[in-house]
Structure formats: C-alpha cells, structure tokens
UniProtKB/Swiss-Prot annotation:
SUBUNIT field: Homodimer.
Gene name of this polypeptide: aspS
Aspartate: annotated segments: 205-208
Organism: Rubrobacter xylanophilus (strain DSM 9941 / JCM 11954 / NBRC 16129 / PRD-1)
Lineage: Bacteria, Bacillati, Actinomycetota, Rubrobacteria, Rubrobacterales
Protein name: Aspartate--tRNA(Asp/Asn) ligase
Similarity-based family: Belongs to the class-II aminoacyl-tRNA synthetase family. Type 1 subfamily.
C-alpha cells in the first residue's frame, strides 16, 4: 500500500487491488490511460507506476458521470469508489487487477493534459528526437518505465551483494584535476581562481587507488563517468558504472567476485539463463585467433581458422602474396545459407570490406569437391585440406580473407556477426559470459608513431614480464581483464601498479617524463611512497548491463535522460549559450569556430 486513509489522493496503487479487496472503499490516483464508452457506462483505465485498474462511471451518478465524459488521455485524476468483481466473462487475465474494477463515486481532475506528441498507451514507433524532447512523457510508456524500474532493481542488488562482502560505498569528487585518460576532459572554469579549471572525472581511477592507500581495502561506488569524446554507436558523454577496488587481491579474486554478482543478477532478476558456468576464460590472443574480436559472442560457432600454411604453398597468388607479406589467410565455414546469388555474395563481400578487406574469397563444399571461382587454384588434396581445416560439411559455404592480421580479424568478425543475425544463430534468452585476459600492456600507434597503453597506464605488468619493460615493452602482457557477454563488453579491469618506480617506468614508455608525471599524477606517485598495498579492481558499466538484460538496442533506452548521438540534451536544450555576465565572472572570452562548424 502506497497511500493511507488520510492521504487525499490515494489509499492504494493502481496495481495492487485484487478480489480480496472486494467491498472496500478506496482512492486511486494516476493518469487516464484509456477511456471507453459502452452501453451507457464509461470505463477508464487508470494508470500509475504500479499498474492499471479499471474504473467504471455510472450515468446514475450524474455529476461524477459528467466529469468522466470530459476526461481525456493523460489527464491526472483522483478517483474514489468501491471495489467490485467484474461481471463474469469480463475479467482481464492480462492485468493483475483484472478480476476487479472500481465503481466510482467521486472524481477529481488534478490536472488536464494537452494532447501528447505521441501515443503513450500503445507501443508504436516514434521518432527518437521527439521521444528525447518529451522524455518525461516517453518515460510514462510501459516499456520505458519497466526499463528504469529494472535498472533500479539491478543497482539495489549490486549494493546489497557488495555490502554483504564488506565493501564500503564511498563517493569521490566530481570536481577534480584534468588528467585525460584517452578522451578529452569536460572542463569547469573556476571563478575563484581565474584561468584555472576543474575537470569532471572520466572515471574515479586515481581516487579509488588512493582509497586503497588509505586502507579502506574494499571500495565501491555507483559512479558517473564523463568523457568528451566523439559520439559513435551507443556511447554517451556521461554514463554510470560500478566502480570497485580491492587491496591485497588477485585477478582470480576479482573475476570470481564479479562472476558471482552477474550470475545472481541474471538468475534472480531475469528469465534469461547463463550459458556457461563458470565463465570461460580466453586470452586476448586466443579470442582474436578464434573469433577475430576481443569481444566475442560465444552463443554460436563459426570460429575462424588459420589456413596460412596451406595458402603459402597454393597457386592462388592473392593468398600466397598476403602470407609472404607477413599477413595471414583465415576463413570460416557456414551452413544453412542455401544457394547464394551473385548479389548475395556481393553483399557478404561488402560486409567484409567494411572491416578493411579488399575482397572475400568463397568456396562451397559440394560432394568431395569445392566449387567456386578460386577452386581451380587448389589441387584436390589442397581442397580436402581446406575443407578439413574449416570443418566444412556438404553444402557449407567457406569464406576467406587474406591480408594483415588486424584487417583479417576485423573483416571476418563482421562477417561472423552478420551471419549470426542472418541465420538466427544466437539464442536471445541466453547470456554467454566470458573473460578476456592477458591483454598486451601496450600497443603501437602507427599514426602518431608512439607506444600507448592498450587499456590504461595504471595496469600492473605480469611479474615475469617486468624485465621486458626495458628491452621489449610491446611484448609485455598486462594483468588486464574484460568481461564480455554476447559480443558486448560489460566491464574492464586490472591489477594496478602500486610501486612508484614501476609506475614512473610505464609513464616514461608512453612518453610521459618525470616532470609531466609529477604535474599530472604527483599525488598518486607520492601516495605510493607510503606503503601502498597491492590492489586491483574493475568498472562494469551499468547502462550496458541493463541494456543487455532488457534486450534493448542501445543504452539510451535504459537511461532516464540520455543525450542524443550528437551529445545534445534535446529536452533541456543543452549545451546552450550563457550570458556575457557569466563569462565575465569566469574571466572567459570566446573564440568561436565558423558558424557552419558550431552546431554538428
């Protein structure tokens, strides 16, 4: 019950009345979901957060009936009346309240409503900008309301799970120092310190490590992360993550903790099932070799196979040249495609080209032979070897990409996911969690000609690889781990560096000298000199997890007030200009780009 006898609006919610309440006088408050006139009676479906209750208005109650005749969708009302059973045959099994209705004896219109810009009582396609502009109305729709309520249940479960394991929830500052972590910082000018700026945190990374130095040992926070980066896919300038850190911990301990949390969330809060328990663990190298991605979807097969050795000795120059140039030839076999037309094959080739491939070679297993435009370049023995390498059965298609490894992996990964969707290979009710571990600590940025951290600069190398920092840093493996489910990265974490000398060495490898390190990270380096314990953690994204569990196409559908893909808040019209007076107070003058570049 969410009201009381003295509450002037409601004694009950619109979702709680049952047959056991028959004969009771109740008050309900909410919105007019639908209104129908039948045989002289008016039927109103009254909706609130908890559900819908049918209310009837009898013409014998003249004034109340007249008021009901004027009701329109989304008017806010309060109704008083008696709970009665619905006439036999008129029950609605689709509603928890479907056995009863309320015979209204009084009606108060609390607020009328303009005609909404879209229907709220029906799930019909609506332009996304309109939905975001009127988000407060969009959130009244059942699917959106359920998304937000489910998100709340997930966050509550996380808090309870971690509290039971002695974690302490600590809020870290939102106004902090600018130390870019791969994306641009959002900057906040200081009025009290002219020409100086705070930054909004891209993550609480340094603060949570400092909390480990402070001795809290087990910390978590439902944290906001803000990044001024180019918007693509389902990224948002601000998102929510479970930020977590532990002292005196190991990679295994972090993985087991999160594995237990995610398994419980899925099994206790959803109807989905966890496909593999315990979660499989794949090294980064293994994931790339088998799936062409460090975010593999394990709900289906279509694994990649390396046929470079076969290609090296073949008569097919495209394959042979790629291998001789230091690249590779890999392929996958797919059944269930039937006869593919030239147009369909061109479409698959285009999918591969989106990953950078210059082409897509194809063969089809027919009987004991292979058919296709490149089959003539392979002997019968080579054809049999290719077929065996890919595990192709009669009728299967075999697709190959020959190029540098990054291009081969990206192209075949795109093709694999395209075939997944085309053939319906993935069970939507299954969650195939897996851990990706042993990432390289560094990668080489060819455009800028320098070494960069693959994840971030605070990651501890594997102990046995520390000597390689001086001789071959690109060969160093980091104590890094990602959690992936159904091809979506849900979390990223690592064991952290806790020694100042080692942290400075990593800084120097990525081009941060001692002076810059002191300026940007001096507090952290100083803290490490005071007996900093070994520590590690992880930061699962709340938005992506809820998106996955609710089968939504993007994270905007599970956020109350998201930005557009162009990083605009359509509802509040932000970002927006500020007054000259505000700028003067902050000692800021504007140097704007040309008009055509100002509003993307």
């Amino acid at each position: 019950m969410h009201g009381t006898a003295t509450n002037p609006y409601r004694t009950h919610t619109a979702g709680e009345l049952r047959a056991s309440n028959v004969g009771q006088r109740v008050r309900l408050a909410g919105w007019v979901h639908r209104r129908r006139d039948h045989g002289g009676l008016i039927f109103v479906d009254l909706r609130d957060r908890w559900g819908i209750t049918q209310v009837t208005f009898d013409p014998e109650r003249g004034e109340v009936f007249s008021a009901a005749e004027r009701l329109r969708p989304e008017w806010s009302v309060s109704v008083e009346g008696e709970v009665v059973r619905r006439p036999e045959g008129n029950e609605n099994p689709e509603l928890p309240t479907g056995e009863i209705e309320v015979e209204a004896s009084s009606l108060r219109v609390l607020n009328a409503s303009e005609t909404p810009p879209f229907e709220i009582d029906r799930e019909r396609p609506v332009d996304e900008l309109t939905r975001l502009r009127y988000r407060y109305l969009d959130l009244r729709r059942e699917r959106m309301r359920e998304n937000i309520l489910f998100r709340d249940r997930v966050v509550r479960y996380i808090r309870r799970y971690l509290a039971e394991r002695d974690f302490v929830e600590v809020e870290t500052p939102l106004l902090t120092k600018s130390t870019p972590e791969g994306a641009r910082d959002y900057l906040v000018p200081s009025r009290l310190y002219p020409g100086q700026f705070y930054a909004l945190p891209q993550s609480p990374q340094q603060f949570k490590q400092l909390l480990m130095v402070a001795g809290l040992e087990r910390y978590f926070q439902i944290a906001r992360a803000l990044r001024d980066e180019d918007q693509r896919g389902d990224r948002q300038p601000e998102h929510t993550q479970l930020d977590l850190e532990m002292s005196y911990t190991t990679q295994d301990e972090v993985l087991q903790l999160i594995e237990g949390l995610y398994t419980e969330i899925v099994e206790r809060l959803t109807e989905k099932r966890v496909l593999f328990k315990p979660f499989p663990r794949l090294t980064y190298a293994e994931a790339m070799e088998r799936f062409g991605s460090d975010k593999p979807d394990l709900r289906f097969g279509l694994e990649l196979r390396d046929v470079s050795d076969l290609a090296r000795s073949s008569e097919f120059k495209v394959f042979r040249n790629a291998v001789e140039a230091g690249g590779s030839v890999r392929g996958l076999a797919a059944g269930g495609l039937g006869d593919l037309s030239r147009r369909e094959l061109d479409g698959l080739t285009e999918v591969a080209r989106e990953g950078g491939a210059r082409g897509l070679a194809h063969l089809r297993a027919e009987g004991k032979a292979l058919k296709g435009p490149v089959a003539k370049f392979f002997s019968a023995e080579e054809q049999a070897a290719l077929r065996e390498a890919l595990g192709a059965r009669p009728g299967d298609w075999m697709f190959f990409v020959a190029d540098r490894d990054p291009v081969v992996f990206e192209s075949l990964n795109r093709l694999r996911l395209h075939l997944r969707d085309r053939l319906g290979l993935a069970d939507r009710d299954a969650l195939a969690f897996c851990w990706i571990t042993d990432f390289p600590l560094f990668e080489y940025n060819e455009e800028e000609g320098r070494i960069e951290p693959m994840h971030h600069m605070f990651t501890m190398p594997r102990e046995e690889d520390i000597p390689l920092l001086d001789t071959d840093p690109l060969a160093v493996t980091g104590q890094l781990y990602d959690l992936v489910a159904n091809g979506v990265e849900l979390a990223s974490g690592s064991i952290r560096i806790h020694r100042p000398d080692l942290q400075q060495k990593v800084f120097s490898i990525i081009g941060i000298d001692e002076e810059e390190a002191e300026r940007r990270f001096g507090t952290l380096l100083r803290a490490f000199r005071y007996g900093a314990p070994p520590h590690g953690g992880i930061a699962p994204g709340i938005d992506r997890l809820v998106m996955l569990l609710r089968d939504e196409p993007n994270i905007r559908e599970v956020m109350a007030f998201p930005k557009t893909q162009a990083a605009r808040d359509e509802m509040m019209d932000a970002p927006s200009p500020v007054s000259e007076e505000q700028l003067r107070e902050l000692h800021i003058s504007l140097c704007l780009p040309p008009e055509e570049r100002r509003n993307p």
